Amino acid sequence: MAHAAQVGLQDATSPIMEELIIFHDHALMIIFLICFLVLYALFLTLTTKLTSTNISDAQEMETVWTILPAIILVLIALPSLRILYMTDEINDPSFTIKSIGHQWYWTYEYTDYGGLIFNSYMLPPLFLEPGDLRLLDVDNRVVLPVEAPVRMMITSQDVLHSWAVPTLGLKTDAIPGRLNQTTFTATRPGLYYGQCSEICGANHSFMPIVLELIPLKIFEMGPVFTL
């Protein structure tokens, strides 16, 4: 999860997030290169005396600053499109969970486990135990297995919400009357936190998401939900 004074992204817990981190570093390298070239050009302009105000045409220069940005855009667009298509792939998920956004809590349905349904509310400060996180912990966590593809069906009952867990590289809008879906495969057990990432009203900041990822063998032994 995120921590104070953190500079980079959160550690990846899914293949998609690993790809996003690589793409972030790739794009950042290009941005640094552009900044260096611009600052270098400004430095030369401000320090050299060999300037001319009579230049009215420079075909070579115009060709370069037209082709070079096009190449840079292609270098950014190709890996971005690859990741975009990866996020849309649905490869035979092991099971499906439905998430419904409300003002201001989440409802989860384990359709493959006897239709288990429960609500997940943020824990008020008075109910926090030692080690719990303020504004991030919930009364009922979403328990999921690692190393198994999971499909999330996401919708809303009232206004726009967004179901997001940064460490998994997930952010899917919850839209009333529409069912969106996303898949992920977690690679490490642990507790992972997210929040509603679409402004949805006065208590938008108070509808967190907590995923408890456990080994697949333990998950298959039976219900382990913290209800």
Curated annotation (Swiss-Prot):
SUPFAM superfamilies: Cupredoxins, Cytochrome c oxidase subunit II-like, transmembrane region. PROSITE patterns: COX2, COX2_CUA, COX2_TM. InterPro entries: CcO_II, CcO_II-like_C, CcO_II_C, Copper_CuA, Cupredoxin, Cyt_c_oxidase_su2, Cyt_c_oxidase_su2_TM_dom, Cyt_c_oxidase_su2_TM_sf. One of its GO terms (cellular component) is mitochondrial inner membrane. Signal peptide: none annotated. Cu cation A1 binds at residues 161, 196, 200, 207. Belongs to the cytochrome c oxidase subunit 2 family. Component of the cytochrome c oxidase, the last enzyme in the mitochondrial electron transport chain which drives oxidative phosphorylation. The respiratory chain contains 3 multisubunit complexes succinate dehydrogenase (complex II, CII), ubiquinol-cytochrome c oxidoreductase (cytochrome b-c1 complex, complex III, CIII) and cytochrome c oxidase (complex IV, CIV), that cooperate to transfer electrons derived from NADH and succinate to molecular oxygen, creating an electrochemical gradient over the inner membrane that drives transmembrane transport and the ATP synthase. Its cofactor is Cu cation. It is found in: Mitochondrion inner membrane. The gene is MT-CO2. Cu cation A2 binds at residues 196, 198, 200, 204. CDD domains: CcO_II_C. GO terms for molecular function: copper ion binding; cytochrome-c oxidase activity. This is Cytochrome c oxidase subunit 2. It is a multi-pass membrane protein. Mg(2+) binds at residue 198. Component of the cytochrome c oxidase (complex IV, CIV), a multisubunit enzyme composed of 14 subunits. The complex is composed of a catalytic core of 3 subunits MT-CO1, MT-CO2 and MT-CO3, encoded in the mitochondrial DNA, and 11 supernumerary subunits COX4I, COX5A, COX5B, COX6A, COX6B, COX6C, COX7A, COX7B, COX7C, COX8 and NDUFA4, which are encoded in the nuclear genome. It comes from Gorilla gorilla beringei (Mountain gorilla). Residues 46-59 are mitochondrial matrix. It catalyses: 4 Fe(II)-[cytochrome c] + O2 + 8 H(+)(in) = 4 Fe(III)-[cytochrome c] + 2 H2O + 4 H(+)(out).
